[in-house]
Regions:
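Short, small-residue-biased leader/transition segments that mark boundaries at the very start
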Residues: 1-4
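Carbohydrate-binding/catalytic loop surfaces
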Residues: 26-54, 95-136
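Hydrophobic alpha-helical membrane-insertion segments, chiefly the h-region
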Residues: 51, 146-150
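Long, well-ordered core segments of solenoidal/helical folds
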Residues: 6-30, 73-97, 152
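Positions within ordered alpha-helical repeat solenoids
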Residues: 14-17, 21, 65-68, 85-88, ...
């Protein structure tokens, strides 16, 4: 219904308010700065522990749908910013991004001085749950997969 679509649009604007539109500066010697991480397009996880993460799942697909539904290109443009930004820390041979093995994706990317765990700004926290990060990126990089699954 149109009402549901309008509510989805409002919710998307709220969710987008948690995404970075600028790049946090990192000091020389901080791992994230040394590998050239750009925070634009990353979502802030919470106001309490203030780190960025790849918690995206179907959000980019929803933004692309909203872009078409409302003829609003900013939604799809920011979905592309999110998508390209999330690719930065994909570890592969020669570009491990501070991760020990290819195929793992870092979680709890610390971009502020607020440190609720270990390592501090410019590093990953020692808390690491690779399962959900892989699931989130799988959804982001295979658009339409969930819809196709539920249509079966």
């Amino acid at each position: 219904t149109r009402r549901s679509s309008d509510l989805t649009k409002k919710a998307a604007y709220f969710a987008l308010s948690w995404y970075y539109l600028w790049d946090v500066p990192f000091a020389p010697g901080q791992m994230l700065g040394d590998i050239g991480l750009k925070t634009r397009g990353w979502g802030n996880v919470s106001v309490e522990n203030n780190h960025i993460d790849v918690f995206i799942f179907e959000f980019a697909s929803i933004l692309n749908w909203l872009s078409k539904e409302y003829s609003e290109p900013r939604f799809s443009q920011f979905a592309e910013v999110i998508s390209t930004s999330m690719r930065q820390l994909l570890p592969y041979e020669g570009h491990l991004c501070g991760v020990a093995k290819c195929g793992y994706y870092p979680e709890v990317v610390q971009h502020t001085n607020w440190d609720y765990g270990k390592n501090g700004k410019g590093y990953y926290n020692d808390i690491f749950a690779p399962g959900w990060t892989v699931a989130s990126l799988w959804e982001l990089f295979s658009p339409g997969r969930a819809e196709q699954f539920f249509r079966k």
